[in-house]
């Protein structure tokens, strides 16, 4: 999965997919009542990027729905996975459940069109704080009470705080999550970061009793960093330059080992050689 980083304006969806992304990451900011409000990152952000592009969250969802619905004039067949980077650190811990409920309602109405031919992309809820695990339970409960528990088949999870892997496992246990787990590791492109924790995550993914299904590394803009991540065995890389990643994937060392994921590839299944 080539994951376009910080795609917060509707116009950027086409821009990143046309450069080779089959996945995008979108920032979600919340108001003080835990309503998802804008697709917005803010300052500071990655080096070489504008930090302040934004849309109202529900408007973005409607644009995203068009981009991921076959037959729509804006349909982008290659776009199969969306990571919502939930900026829930602005909330109190006891608001996490409400944030999950309100997020589910927004997606149900504006993206899934209440289960009536909505967008088809798989969705990852990426949460920065292990203490906010109730965001997941609130989200799940809401889809159930609204009569669409089947949509949870399209939803996966990530804790993005670079926490100790054992602590991440505990948070999922509390949230009742068994599967659909992506594990991120990374840092802003302005700073270097080693691959030690990525390798730990990959080892968990590949062990018989691991809880991780997929591992991605962020934010990868250089060819050398891309090669390091691929050599470590990641499933995805998040990038400001999808064309750079696509380029490296076409090198002889990688093109026999990796291919770009399509809609037929289940993002919740651990890849077995």
UniProtKB/Swiss-Prot annotation:
Record EC number: 4.6.1.-
Catalytic residue list: 5, 41 (nucleophile)
Cell location: Secreted
Gene Ontology MF, one: lyase activity
N-terminal signal peptide: none
Cofactors, names only: Mg(2+)
Group of enzyme by EC: lyase
Residue numbers binding Mg(2+): 25, 27, 85
Record's protein name: Dermonecrotic toxin LdSicTox-alphaIB3b
Lineage: Eukaryota, Metazoa, Ecdysozoa, Arthropoda, Chelicerata
GO biological process, one term: lipid catabolic process
UniProt cross-references to InterPro entries, sorted A to Z: PLC-like_Pdiesterase_TIM-brl (IPR017946)
Function: Dermonecrotic toxins cleave the phosphodiester linkage between the phosphate and headgroup of certain phospholipids (sphingolipid and lysolipid substrates), forming an alcohol (often choline) and a cyclic phosphate. This toxin acts on sphingomyelin (SM). It may also act on ceramide phosphoethanolamine (CPE), lysophosphatidylcholine (LPC) and lysophosphatidylethanolamine (LPE), but not on lysophosphatidylserine (LPS), and lysophosphatidylglycerol (LPG). It acts by transphosphatidylation, releasing exclusively cyclic phosphate products as second products.
Disulfide bonds: 45-51, 47-190
Example of a GO cellular component annotation carried by this entry: extracellular region
Tissue expression notes: Expressed by the venom gland.
Catalytic activity: an N-(acyl)-sphingosylphosphocholine = an N-(acyl)-sphingosyl-1,3-cyclic phosphate + choline; an N-(acyl)-sphingosylphosphoethanolamine = an N-(acyl)-sphingosyl-1,3-cyclic phosphate + ethanolamine; a 1-acyl-sn-glycero-3-phosphocholine = a 1-acyl-sn-glycero-2,3-cyclic phosphate + choline; a 1-acyl-sn-glycero-3-phosphoethanolamine = a 1-acyl-sn-glycero-2,3-cyclic phosphate + ethanolamine
Protein keywords: Cytolysis, Dermonecrotic toxin, Disulfide bond, Hemolysis, Lipid degradation, Lipid metabolism, Lyase, Magnesium, Metal-binding, Secreted, Toxin
Note on cofactor: Binds 1 Mg(2+) ion per subunit.
Gene3D superfamilies: Phosphatidylinositol (PI) phosphodiesterase
